[in-house]
Curated annotation (Swiss-Prot):
It comes from Cupriavidus metallidurans (strain ATCC 43123 / DSM 2839 / NBRC 102507 / CH34). Gene3D superfamilies: Anticodon-binding domain, Bira Bifunctional Protein, Domain 2. The gene is proS. Its EC number is 6.1.1.15. GO terms for cellular component: cytosol. This is Proline--tRNA ligase. Consists of three domains: the N-terminal catalytic domain, the editing domain and the C-terminal anticodon-binding domain.
Length: 573
């Protein structure tokens, strides 16, 4: 490949609307061009990286025994209505009508379509297991597309779907895909973690996310440095910080706390540790009988985990109570609420840590007043108890093998055990060896192909530009001749090196544009090609060229006769 036959369109400055590093560098490197909100053209440089990612994904999926197919981007609404997702999914599911007023969805995932394939094609246990996958365009109508391709609306995704005869088969398929994902991300050359996760709207029973570690990641990853425990913040278990509850040492006292509606302000005003305060969070669930009010209690320095709250029996479809509902139920505005003496009955659920607290401070259900010296069993009934909070660094690891730490990550892959969530709703069944009809056990497995690009950049860049891991770089090597258009010796040697590297199977590009050295070097450092060979007249007179790795501070002189072998050695390192 020669640069004159390629398309290079770099920018000195990033567009004003580019917010994060990957967005800025992808725009500057000419990898993407914005077409609309969350919609991008992938230019030749960017597409080469996508193809490298896709090739690795495809190789490992095939190695794992998955079978590639392709499903339509536009899908009939009837399939989505069978599973209930047509109504359950919000505006992020793009819906449209054809000329006959028939409803369709633009696929964000393809569970319904692949289940339809399975139910029409699979009849017997002898046809199982099977795992179908595709690498296909997806669309989610994000409310606020941002961060370039990291939170775009149109994207490329690898989605796979396994079908098994029983739970043991599903577990085996799940582990097979988990192992394949580990190989994929190792081949990408990225630092990553696989973490236990919540299944969310897709449904099912088991789930892991794969995160690329990056300081700019939007997700919090909880892990134990001394064990294999890892989970995302939604799923990380928070153990009680107190093993047992101490006996009461204080009397219950109602104390004036004028204009102190936040736990930190109450603690400062009363001169007590924030850890002695309890925060009240009011939720509501709706039914034909009306709204049921819930009071969730967490320690003043902790944060509510809404996913965990939704796991409390009865709270699956909770909403936050309105201020009118709060005042009507507690007789007090928010900021002064607590479990003692609400005007109307409420369901109280305490976080594990709160359940073991004694002599704590909470709202008195009276504006400008709080209780101190509050104790369970003496001042109010024992509560229902649940894990309600986000973990914090230093918490005990649930596996008992150390304490937890927290880092940031970018989710780029997700594996789910769906079970019979879709097969039962869509009647995807098979006949077992006894001739009995059984629902297929399903798993689904996604990788954000285009998102990998942004995540890789967020983890690998410097002040000069992108530093691609070798496996997914747009080119492995760039040959930069200084004076290619005016020095025959330089041109001849650059052409020879380029030709020999091509013959050796190296993905190399020759910059024959005739640009000044500064422009040429800046372009390729910005684009992030891992290896560079510079051919110049001065070096050739000494029988040398210069090799420089993208992370190297200095160039290394290499004999002209040895340069191809040297580069191949660096590629193999």
């Amino acid at each position: 490949m020669k640069a004159s036959q390629f398309f290079i369109s770099t920018l000195k400055e990033a567009p004003a609307d580019a917010e994060i590093v990957s967005h800025k560098l992808m725009m500057r490197a000419g990898m993407i061009k914005k077409l609309g909100a969350g919609i991008y053209n992938y230019m030749p440089v960017g597409l080469r990286v996508i193809r490298k990612v896709e090739n690795i994904v495809r190789e490992e999926m095939n190695r794992a025994g998955a079978v590639e197919l392709s499903m339509p981007v536009i899908q009939p609404a009837e399939l989505w209505q069978e599973t209930g997702r047509w109504d359950k999914m919000g505006p992020e599911l793009l819906r449209l009508k054809d000329r006959h007023e028939r409803d369709f969805a633009v696929q964000p995932t393809s569970e319904e379509v692949v289940t339809d394939i399975a139910r029409t094609e699979i009849r017997s246990y002898k046809q199982l297991p099977v795992n179908f996958y595709q690498i296909q365009t997806k669309f989610r109508d994000e409310r606020r597309p941002r961060f370039g391709i990291m939170r775009g609306r149109e994207f490329t995704m690898k989605d796979a779907y396994s079908f098994d005869r029983d739970i043991d088969g599903l577990k085996a398929s799940y582990q097979n895909m988990y192992d394949a994902y580990v190989r994929i991300f190792q081949r990408f050359g990225l630092e990553f973690r696989a973490v236990a996760a919540d299944n969310g709207a897709i449904g099912g029973s088991g789930s892991h996310e794969f995160h690329v570690i990056a300081d700019t990641g939007e997700d919090a990853i909880v892990y134990c440095p001394t064990s294999d425990y890892a989970a995302n913040m939604e799923a990380a278990e928070a153990l009680p910080l107190l093993a047992t509850r101490a006996a009461p040492a204080e009397e219950l006292k109602k104390t004036s706390t004028p204009e102190k509606a936040k736990c930190e302000h109450v603690a400062e005003f009363l001169g007590i540790p924030l850890e002695r305060t309890v925060k009240s969070i009011v939720l509501a669930t709706d039914s034909d009988a009306g709204a049921q009010i819930w009071l969730l209690l967490i320690r003043g320095d902790h944060e509510l985990n809404e996913v965990k709250a939704s796991k409390v029996p009865g709270l699956a479809d909770f909403r936050f109570a309105t201020e009118t509902e709060i005042v009507d139920t507690f007789g007090s505005p928010p900021g002064y609420l607590g479990p003692i003496g609400p005007k109307k009955p409420v369901k109280v659920v305490a976080d594990r840590t709160v359940a073991n607290m004694s002599d704590f401070c909470c709202g008195a259900n009276d504006r400008d007043y709080h209780y101190t010296g509050v104790n369970w069993g003496r001042d109010l009934p024992e509560p229902a108890v649940a894990d309600l909070r986000n973990v914090v660094a230093g918490d005990a690891s649930p596996d008992g093998k150390g304490t937890l730490d927290i880092c940031r990550g970018i989710e780029v892959g997700h594996v789910f055990m769906l079970g019979t969530r879709y097969s039962e709703s869509m009647n995807a069944t098979f006949l077992d060896e006894n001739g009995k009809t059984q629902p297929m056990q399903m798993g689904c497995y996604g990788i954000g192909v285009t998102r990998i690009l942004g995540a890789a950049i967020e983890q690998n860049y410097d002040e000069r530009g992108i530093i691609w891991p070798a496996a997914i770089a747009p080119f492995a090597v760039v040959v930069c001749p200084v004076g290619y258009d005016r020095n025959e010796a330089v041109k001849a040697e650059a052409d020879r090196i380029h030709a020999e590297l091509l013959a050796a199977g190296v993905d190399v590009i020759l910059d024959d544009r005739g640009e000044r050295p500064g422009v040429m070097f800046a372009d390729w450092e910005l684009i992030g090609v891992p290896h560079r060979v510079v051919v110049g007249d001065r070096g050739l007179k000494e029988g040398k060229v210069e090799y420089q790795g993208r992370r190297d501070a200095q160039a290394t002189p290499v004999a002209v006769a040895d340069v191809v072998a040297h580069v191949r050695g660096q590629l193999a390192a």
